[in-house]
């Protein structure tokens, strides 16, 4: 569980797996054609300084479409820092890790198993007991984020063919997902719009 394995915020990847940093910067038109996404280990779905709708929303949508089509790609975020800057109110990437663990190996394992969180503050943990999904929110104390009461959060569970919206206290039977085996969980404040997205959780494989 998360309390036994503390979550680490990644500040830099070092010698990282192969990353697709979505080339949609506002002032620069980088374009490329990728025919084999199996070569990519993760996609930077948020670059914090970039505009939400013009850039980052496209990154989120691309990642969702690839994952739900069966690609094993993790989600991360970034911040193009060229000096001192506040990270208050921005997304960060979190992974599970041990206090004295090998961070490089833990990052590699998290990436290759899609076990990353991209969040502004609260982390959404999803539990699968073999019959239903249930949920826990962990507040990280991240600077710039003011926690809400649990009932003010909404969760979406997106599959290839459906979108289920629920609350943190709900249990969602696995039979709700019909034939879908891949689920993307996200946590929102009050309303399930991208402006209110506070956490993208690890992909669930049933």
Language-model segments: residues:
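C-terminal functional module detector
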Residues: 69-74, 79-206
